[in-house]
């Protein structure tokens, strides 16, 4: 999982693109360069000469600070270069700096995570489509996908999903034809198929698997959790022999989703924060699969506590304080001896 490359795009507002670029340049100790163009872009180089960018996105609803009126300059999208796992900490620090500088998000903002698709093939891509489809309902609930943003991150296309699993493509060309439902649209940047939670248009046009289902946040821990989740899902698709697209049904969503996260490899202290963020919006009992078992355990613990309390009370009743021992008892005790 940790060997996969990735990139991230985080939409925000509250500050201008120029301000955001200066903040990032300040973090790296370099200079921001205005590029302009269609996306009114700024470029910032790091110590490895990688390019981090700030660009405009028309879907962002601009908001400004207290004393200024919002305009299109407040549409800010942060775009990372190709990153490795250790870069997550750098991304977190940049996010903290932007937030401290006045950046904020609203319900028009989203986060897109791209995972390198070069290690995938037609089989593993079918796996990842099915893995996502099976857990889609739980993912949308735990991530609280904003209803207003759902047109930009639609659930799996049932036509594509059914065809993918009935015909089982043997090569990437067949998969591409199924994705576009005919003629390829890989050269169309804004092809309509891109607006899905799992976007394979990005595979054919950019060489990345794009996850689009995250509401934007400037909480560094949440951003880290989203990246780790995407890397874990991609890794599971790579190592799993096959995957079913049958939707997961559960009467205890929190337990079911936690079990899945552990199966993905998000286990141990390293991923404790990720599990916390990814489970906090789900209902259920994290420790017991069956809610009835949880209730039964509560009753057992309550009965045990009651029994212990009663035993403690009985012990106290049978204990005679030292100052209440009679004189005869004291004499008897002092006369007792052992001869050798």
Task: Identify the meaning behind each predicted range.
Residues 107-111, 115:
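Short, conserved phosphate-binding/catalytic loop or strand-edge motifs used
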Residues 1-104, 118-340:
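C-terminal accessory/tail domains of diverse enzymes
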